């Protein structure tokens, strides 16, 4: 019971003090502090019903000619931050992470592993130290694991939790509770997992029965999804024999790269990725690169603003993520990639964008869609400022993100005077740009972001080319991926006013 648990914790603290084990003591006290904060956070912000959502923030951007200049470091990559915690937790020994993204989503992952008994120090100024418990060291959480708004956390953890000795339940906020989870549950069941999603649409909460013996699987992904691929591979760490995933097109490969950085052998042959179960991970140093998905807003802002000159420093340019650079280049943007180097197994570079010429409308290449899936809302703003028509196809995945990003972006673009037609798997946007002209493109208006951080940040960049005031409703979720967004945008010259 609770009293026994309290006595056990006191005994643990006494032993750590007697042994002068300061590392473990700091981790335990950090866990206690974080648990209290996390519980308060869940009480305040856990909205299972949309109409219970108490906190709504909005951005206001006034019209007027603006410049867009400066050198910036955007926050750490969210995908790499999630994985650094997950893999550090099940590694043997200590993992030290720098550049960790202290946003809501990555913190949900961190808290989940604290709830499963992992001692984690930080985060403080992007630094996290994880005292790994090994692949068999996770403990049953006392209650449901709360994933907030993070689909990555839930899908990857579905794979890991399916292989544990204990039962578990994962819940999320109102937005995550609408997102499809059967796409990961189905292959895990084929491996022998007992996993249940909720309702006809297979959404969270997700319930997993532990103590199942998993078998390796050879799975052909029906859609390009790095999250589903990663969930299967992570289950494969505990499965008997080989687990392989074949993807229809390449998706981001952070899981494969980071498993190798932790000493786990992962083979990639074309579009087939495989690993053998039963190995171990060894603690390491992870430097998290700046997030190209966050940098994308500044790339687009600079590309649509006359005379702009923006450099984004130490951005991750993993080849499975650089679709946004390729698409902007095809539209005619003045982008240079400088000072390329490797950090923590990931390629990084400085990206410079200058506003020297009007963008051109294009048919966005379908082979770039999985490589730019999170950047399309920002690219739609670029397309509206381009000369001529832009067509996107093959991007049905956008309809099941934090919001239906095709429909929500189309609604907002129409509100601000842009002619566009959403389709089942994309959109057609009639750009209002003219060669050599840099005047207003958007008329302004009130935009409903549907509490989707990428929608809110994308429409913020429209403020660089607007003739009327832009109000964006429901921007509080920007903190999930880019806590310093308004600060950096305003340093560059955008002038966003934030009201709670």
For the regions a protein language model found, what residue spans apply to each?
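Short helix/strand-capping connector loops at secondary-structure junctions
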Residues: 8-21, 465-473
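C-terminal helix-rich "cap/oligomerization" subdomain common to oxidoreductases
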Residues: 12-51
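Structural preference for solvent-exposed beta-strand-turn elements
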Residues: 49-500
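NAD(P)-dinucleotide binding in Rossmann-like oxidoreductases
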Residues: 1-8
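A subset of signal/propeptide-processing and intrinsically disordered low-complexity segments
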Residues: 4, 14-16, 26, 286, ...
């Amino acid at each position: 019971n609770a009293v026994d648990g309290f006595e056990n914790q006191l005994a643990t603290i006494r032993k750590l003090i007697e042994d002068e084990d300061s590392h473990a003591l700091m981790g335990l006290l950090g866990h206690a502090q974080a648990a209290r904060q996390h519980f308060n956070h869940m009480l305040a912000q856990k909205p299972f019903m949309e109409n219970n959502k108490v906190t709504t923030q909005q951005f206001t951007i006034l019209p007027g000619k603006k410049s867009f200049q400066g050198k910036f470091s955007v926050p750490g990559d969210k995908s790499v931050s999630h994985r650094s915690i997950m893999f550090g937790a099940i590694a043997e020994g200590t993992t030290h992470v720098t550049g960790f993204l202290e946003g809501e989503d990555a913190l949900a992952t961190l808290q989940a592993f604290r709830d499963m008994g992992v001692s984690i120090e930080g985060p403080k100024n992007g630094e996290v130290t994880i005292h790994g418990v090994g692949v068999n060291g996770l403990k049953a959480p006392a209650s449901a694991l709360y994933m907030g708004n993070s689909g990555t956390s839930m899908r990857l953890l579905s794979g890991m939790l399916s292989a544990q000795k204990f039962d578990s339940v994962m819940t999320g906020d109102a937005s995550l509770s609408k997102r499809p989870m059967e796409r990961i549950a189905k292959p895990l069941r084929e491996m022998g997992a007992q996993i249940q999603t909720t309702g006809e649409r297979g959404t969270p909460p997700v319930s997993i029965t532990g103590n199942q013996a998993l078998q390796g699987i050879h799975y052909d992904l029906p859609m390009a999804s790095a999250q589903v691929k990663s969930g299967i591979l992570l289950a494969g760490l505990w499965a008997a024999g080989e687990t392989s995933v074949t993807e229809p097109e390449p998706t981001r490969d952070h899981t494969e790269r980071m498993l190798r950085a932790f000493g786990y052998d992962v083979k990639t042959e074309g579009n087939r990725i495989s690993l053998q179960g039963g190995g171990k991970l060894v603690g390491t140093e992870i430097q998290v690169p700046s997030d190209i998905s966050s940098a994308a807003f500044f790339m687009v802002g600079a590309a649509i603003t006359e005379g702009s000159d923006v450099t984004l420093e130490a951005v991750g340019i993993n080849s499975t993520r650089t679709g946004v650079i390729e698409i902007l280049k095809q539209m005619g943007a003045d982008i240079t990639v400088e000072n390329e180097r490797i950090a923590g197994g990931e390629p990084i570079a400085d990206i410079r964008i200058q506003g020297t010429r009007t963008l051109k409308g294009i048919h966005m290449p379908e082979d770039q869609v999985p490589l730019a899936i999170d950047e399309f809302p920002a690219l739609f703003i670029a397309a509206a400022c381009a000369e001529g028509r832009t067509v996107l196809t093959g991007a049905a995945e956008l309809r099941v993100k934090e919001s239906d990003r095709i429909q929500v972006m189309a609604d907002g673009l129409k509100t601000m005077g842009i002619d566009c037609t959403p389709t089942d798997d994309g959109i057609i946007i009639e750009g209002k740009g003219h060669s050599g002209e840099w005047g207003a493109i958007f008329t302004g208006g009130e935009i409903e972001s549907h509490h989707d951080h990428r929608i809110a940040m994308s429409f913020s960049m429209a403020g660089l080319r607007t003739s009327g005031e832009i109000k964006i409703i429901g921007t509080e979720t920007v903190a999930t991926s880019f806590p310093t967004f308004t600060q950096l945008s305003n340093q560059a010259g955008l002038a966003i006013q934030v009201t709670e």
